[in-house]
Amino acid sequence: MTPHLPTSLTGSTSVRLAFATAAVLSMLGGTAEAEEGGTGHYLPGSMASSIDSAPAKESFLMRLNVVNYDGSIGKNQPLPIAGLTAVGVDAKSTGVGLTAVWRPSFEIGEGWSYALTATLPYVWLDVSADVGAQGLAVRRSSSVNGLGDIVLQPLLINQNVNPDFNINYRVSLYAPTGSYEVGRLANTGKNFWTVEPTVGFMYFGQKNGIEASTFVGVDFNRTNPDTDYKSGTQVHVDATLAQHFPWQGGLVGLGINAYYYQQVTGDSGAGATPGDFKAKTLGLGPVASFVGKVGGHDLVSELKWVHESSTTNRLKGDLIWLKVLYKFY
């Protein structure tokens, strides 16, 4: 039986995991990659597969994303967190994000379509770390929950090259809407703006069921006005290779997800006391998906686990993602 990909995965449905970005990374108001607090707005691995593609036809979509992260960094690596210098950082977080995607009816050219998205993240975060001068550090803990940094995507363009291949062009804006306090280990927001252009290349064979997707993005960060800390520019590459096959009237996909993250410019500002603090990391793990119909409309779900390795100047840990997307029309 030849697998047939529903329109929700050929480019007519999609949402981005940016909310997970806000849901997990934003909530790590100081704990995860490099940059201030050891984390940026973008969560590596958040855009990596066809479920993160852009709509090619008129549609309205909603997606629920649930992300769990558990990471730590050793006591030999100091992290700048909300005006503090911390070592031995442990962070556990859960983020729930709701993303709305609207693709209007008008076309911008043959094979080209436009959409826009907005994401509301809610996060729970627990952070513990040793804070203070060397030899006098005190173990501190902080827990917080609330609205994270909202993600707006005013520009999301899809180029339908052929039935099997699409290219996405998008610009995301991370707004500092989450809670932030200087001197608090856990914050639901980053307290600065980020602009993130991304290009995604998605191949999905309508006859062979093979998926090969790659997303390349760059994050440009503004200065945190409360700490005078400007996080450096980051480049991230995320990819998925999967095989999809018919099952129970739908499509099942099994494959692997990988990402590479590299900070390409150093941190700056009066608050960047640890220096330029560049970071990098590599992640790899399995991914499974299912596409079916509910109420006559496409329902897409994806579950994946990503394990981090080869990590420098950021937390190292594991992420578990669950994404559920529903196409209303």
Give the predicted meaning of each segment.
Residues 40-43, 62-70, 116-122, 169-175, ...:
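Transmembrane beta-barrel strands of outer-membrane/channel proteins
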Residues 35-36, 51-59, 71-73, 105-114, ...:
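Short loop/turn motifs that connect adjacent beta-strands in outer-membrane beta-barrel proteins
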